[in-house]
């Protein structure tokens, strides 16, 4: 009986749409430290129909918009969601992303819930939020909710 989800996948996996998926793959691997798992060429061998990246074993799928599906660059509207990624060294990750040209939307900052975080946008307008869990916090320590 096959595994569901397949091995190497999670039950929830972001699927991101980029006008230039090949450029997005290059940026996400160089700026944010993702690893490319696979890439399928589009019709006639052009562009990227589907690709899969991962960060520390967590997959992200991406492709080129088409039909009813559109990415933030094609709509002219900010991404209505963001991808949240835990990293091992938030400050080094921030420096790498900034050096690679990511638009930093929120500088690294300690949060009340025990994470140190920063926000960024990639060159095609996708929003990303990176975090490092730096201290354990109880619900009482975090305050009223």
Annotate each PLM feature:
Residues 1-15, 25-121, 131-145:
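Vicinal oxygen chelate
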Residues 18-22:
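Short acidic-aromatic low-complexity motifs
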């Amino acid at each position: 009986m096959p595994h569901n989800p397949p091995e190497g996948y999670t039950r929830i996996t972001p699927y991101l749409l980029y006008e230039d998926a090949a450029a997005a793959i290059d940026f996400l691997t160089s700026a944010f430290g993702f690893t490319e798992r696979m890439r399928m060429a589009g019709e006639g061998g052009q562009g990227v129909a589907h690709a899969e990246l991962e960060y520390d074993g967590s997959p992200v799928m991406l492709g080129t918009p088409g039909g009813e599906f559109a990415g933030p660059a094609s709509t002219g509207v900010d991404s209505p969601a963001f991808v949240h990624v835990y990293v091992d060294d938030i400050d080094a990750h921030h420096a790498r992303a900034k050096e690679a040209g990511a638009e930093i939307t929120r500088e690294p900052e300690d949060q009340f819930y025990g994470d140190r975080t920063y926000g960024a946008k990639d060159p095609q307008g996708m929003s990303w939020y990176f975090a490092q869990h730096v201290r354990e916090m109880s619900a009482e320590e975090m305050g009223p909710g």
